[in-house]
C-alpha cells in the first residue's frame, strides 16, 4: 500500500495546486458523495429484489429481452463500481482519522490528496473512479436528454483508464438504445436505492443482485438465456465436491462465471484469501466474456477470460489446472469434428489414442477437453447430458478408455428440472488424474434423482441439506471410510471397475445403487384387496362417463 511519505513529498512540491483544487469542490458534490457512502439501515430482501426486477422488466415494452438485459446488467455493474469506490473511500477516511493507523494525519490538505490517490484504491482491488464515471454524476444528469451518451462516455473513460480489466466489458449501448431520459431516470432512481452498510458489503449485495437478475433473465429468455447461466445449486455442489481451495480453476465454457463465483464464496466462507485462486475461462460468445468479467469485478476478483471456440481454438492449450469445472452445451451437433487433427493431444487417454467424437454430438469432445486440462494432481467436475453415461460406438470406446485408466471417481444422477425451461436429464462427472491407493479402481455412484425441492412448476433446486448429503458421501469416499458406511441402498454405492466392465462400461448410477423398497408393514393380501376395490371403482366410474358422453353425442345428433 502507498505510504504517507509519498504524500508529504507531493504536498511540499505541489501545495499551491492542491489548494486551488480544493476550492473548486462544491458543497453539492460533497453532499451527493456522502449520501452514497453507506446506508446502515439498508436491507436486501426478496421483496426488494422483486421490486428491482419489476422496474427493469418494464423495459420489455421497448426492447427485446436480449437487448435490455445488457442495459440493466450494465447499470447494475456501474452502480456497484461506485458503491465499492465509496465503500473504500470511507475505509480510507476512517484510517486517516484513527490515531492508531499508519495513515493518521490531521492535515486536511494531505487527507484530500490521499483520498484522491488511486493507489489507495487499487491496492485493495477497487477501481478509482473519475467524477464523470460515478453514479452520483448520472443522478445529477439523469433528466438530461443525452443521458445515454453520458453513460457511454463514462464507460469509454473507464475502458481507457483500465483497459486490462474493462476493455469491451460494459456494452456501450445506452446512446443508441430506444430508451429516453425518462426511462433511464426510472432505472437510475430505483437502482440508487441499492446500497450497503456495515452489515452489507458491496460485493455481497451486488453479487446477489447480479446473480438474481441473471436467473430472472434466464426465466424470460428460456433456453437462449440458459446457455449463460448454470443453476447456483449445481455450481455450489460441484465446487464443494471438488473442495476448491487455492490454486488454479478453469472453465472452458464459462457462460456468466457462475462456477467462479461459487468457488470465491467457498474460499471466503473458509477464511481463505480469494487472491489465492487464479481464475481462467473461455467462451465462444463475446457476451459471456462480458458477463463473466462483470461478475468477477463485482466480487473484487480478476480472471484471465478469453473469447473463442474451445473445440478448435483452445486459448489455454499449453496449460493444466488444479480444478476444471464446466457446464458445456449439451449434445452439441455439427461442431466441425473434421477440424480436429489426428495428433490433437486431447485425443489421448493415458497411453491410449482415442478416436475423434462424432460430429453429431460433442459431449465426448468436451469430456476429453476437461481431462486434458486437468493437472496431474488436479480434479474436474462438470455437468453432462445423461446420454453420455451409456452412449455406444465411438463414444462408448472413449468412455471405456476413460474408465480403464481409472480417471472417474464419481458420478451423480441429478434430479429433474434443475435447469429452467430445460427438461433434459443431467448428471455430474468427477475426474481425478491421481487417486489415493484406497480409491484406485473404484467409482462412487450417487442417485440423487429424488433429492430436490420444487420451487415452481418448471424448476427444482438442490437445498443446502441435499448438497451436504451428497458432499458427505464424497468426503467419506475420499477419506478412505469403510464402504459399508458409504453404501446406501437406492442412493450411494462404491463400485469397482470390474463391476462397471460387467455392465458394459455404462456409468448410469441406477445400475449400481439398487432400488430401495419401502416396507409399510401392510400384508400383501390386504394391499391386493384394496387395489382391486380401487380398480373396480375406477372402472365403474369410467363406464358412467362413457354413457354420459354417449348421451351428449346422441342429443347433438352424432
From Swiss-Prot:
Residues 8-18 have a biased composition (Basic and acidic residues). GO terms for biological process: DNA restriction-modification system; methylation. Gene3D superfamilies: 1.20.1260.30, Vaccinia Virus protein VP39. InterPro entries: D12N6_MeTrfase_N, DNA_methylase_A-5, DNA_methylase_N6_adenine_CS, SAM-dependent_MTases_sf, T1MK-like_N_sf, Type-I_RE_MTase_Subunit. It catalyses: a 2'-deoxyadenosine in DNA + S-adenosyl-L-methionine = an N(6)-methyl-2'-deoxyadenosine in DNA + S-adenosyl-L-homocysteine + H(+). GO terms for molecular function: DNA binding; N-methyltransferase activity; site-specific DNA-methyltransferase (adenine-specific) activity. It is an enzyme of class 2 (transferase). Its EC number is 2.1.1.72. It comes from the Archaea. Type I restriction and modification enzymes are complex, multifunctional systems which require ATP, S-adenosyl methionine and Mg(2+) as cofactors and, in addition to their endonucleolytic and methylase activities, are potent DNA-dependent ATPases. This is Type I restriction enzyme MjaIX methylase subunit. It comes from Methanocaldococcus jannaschii (strain ATCC 43067 / DSM 2661 / JAL-1 / JCM 10045 / NBRC 100440) (Methanococcus jannaschii).
Amino acid at each position: 500500500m502507498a505510504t504517507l511519505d509519498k504524500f508529504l513529498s507531493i504536498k511540499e512540491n505541489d501545495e499551491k495546486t492542491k489548494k486551488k483544487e480544493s476550492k473548486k469542490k462544491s458543497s453539492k458534490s460533497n453532499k451527493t458523495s456522502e449520501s452514497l457512502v453507506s446506508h446502515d439501515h439498508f436491507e436486501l430482501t426478496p421483496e426488494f429484489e422483486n421490486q428491482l426486477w419489476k422496474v427493469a422488466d418494464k423495459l420489455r415494452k421497448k426492447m427485446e429481452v436480449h437487448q435490455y438485459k445488457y442495459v440493466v446488467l450494465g447499470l447494475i455493474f456501474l452502480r456497484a463500481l461506485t458503491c465499492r469506490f465509496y465503500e473504500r473511500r470511507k475505509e480510507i477516511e476512517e484510517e486517516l482519522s484513527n490515531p492508531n493507523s499508519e495513515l493518521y494525519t490531521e492535515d486536511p490538505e494531505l487527507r484530500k490528496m490521499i483520498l484522491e490517490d488511486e493507489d489507495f484504491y487499487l491496492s485493495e482491488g477497487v477501481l478509482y473512479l473519475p467524477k464523470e464515471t460515478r453514479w452520483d454524476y448520472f443522478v445529477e444528469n439523469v433528466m438530461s436528454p443525452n443521458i445515454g451518451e453520458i453513460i457511454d462516455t463514462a464507460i469509454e473513460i473507464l475502458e481507457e483508464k483500465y483497459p486490462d480489466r474493462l476493455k469491451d466489458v460494459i456494452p456501450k449501448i445506452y446512446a443508441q438504445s430506444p430508451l429516453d431520459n425518462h426511462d433511464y431516470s426510472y432505472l437510475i432512481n430505483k437502482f440508487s436505492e441499492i446500497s450497503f452498510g456495515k452489515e452489507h458489503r458491496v460485493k455481497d449485495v451486488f453479487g446477489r443482485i447480479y446473480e438474481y437478475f441473471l436467473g430472472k433473465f434466464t426465466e424470460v429468455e428460456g433456453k437462449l438465456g440458459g446457455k449463460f447461466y448454470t443453476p447456483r445449486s449445481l455450481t455450489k455442489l460441484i465446487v464443494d465436491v471438488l473442495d476448491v481451495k487455492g490454486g488454479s480453476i478453469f472453465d472452458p465454457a464459462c457462460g456468466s462465471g457462475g462456477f467462479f463465483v461459487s468457488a470465491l464464496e467457498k474460499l471466503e466462507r473458509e477464511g481463505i484469501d480469494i487472491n489465492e485462486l487464479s481464475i481462467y475461462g473461455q467462451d465462444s460468445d463475446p457476451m459471456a466474456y462480458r458477463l463473466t468479467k462483470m461478475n468477477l469485478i463485482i466480487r473484487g476478483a480478476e480472471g484471465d477470460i478469453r473469447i473463442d471456440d474451445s473445440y478448435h481454438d483452445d486459448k489455454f492449450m499449453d496449460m493444466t489446472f488444479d480444478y476444471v469445472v464446466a457446464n458445456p452445451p449439451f449434445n452439441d451437433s455439427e461442431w466441425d469434428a473434421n477440424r480436429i487433427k489426428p495428433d490433437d493431444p486431447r485425443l489421448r487417454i493415458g497411453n491410449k489414442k482415442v478416436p475423434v467424437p462424432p460430429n453429431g454430438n460433442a459431449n465426448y469432445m468436451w469430456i476429453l477437453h476437461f481431462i486434458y486440462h486437468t493437472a496431474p494432481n488436479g480434479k474436474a467436475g462438470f455437468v453432462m447430458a445423461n446420454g453420455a453415461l451409456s452412449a455406444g460406438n465411438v463414444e462408448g470406446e472413449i468412455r471405456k478408455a476413460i474408465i480403464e485408466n481409472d480417471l472417474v471417481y464419481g458420478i451423480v444422477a441429478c434430479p429433474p428440472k434443475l435447469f429452467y425451461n430445460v427438461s433434459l436429464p443431467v448428471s455430474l462427472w468427477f475426474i481425478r488424474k491421481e487417486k489415493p491407493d484406497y480409491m484406485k479402481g473404484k467409482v462412487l455412484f450417487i442417485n440423487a434423482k429424488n433429492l430436490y425441492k420444487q420451487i415452481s412448476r418448471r424448476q427444482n433446486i438442490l437445498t443446502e441439506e441435499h448438497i451436504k448429503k451428497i458432499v458427505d458421501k464424497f468426503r467419506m469416499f475420499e477419506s478412505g471410510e469403510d464402504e459399508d458406511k458409504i453404501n446406501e441402498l437406492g442412493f450411494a454405492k462404491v463400485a469397482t471397475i470390474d463391476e462397471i466392465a460387467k455392465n458394459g462400461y455404462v456409468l448410469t448410477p441406477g445400475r449400481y445403487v439398487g432400488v430401495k423398497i419401502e416396507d409399510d408393514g401392510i400384508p400383501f393380501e390386504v394391499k391386493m384387496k384394496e387395489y382391486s376395490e380401487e380398480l373396480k371403482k375406477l372402472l365403474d366410474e369410467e363406464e358412467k362417463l362413457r354413457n354420459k358422453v354417449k348421451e351428449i353425442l346422441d342429443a347433438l345428433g352424432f
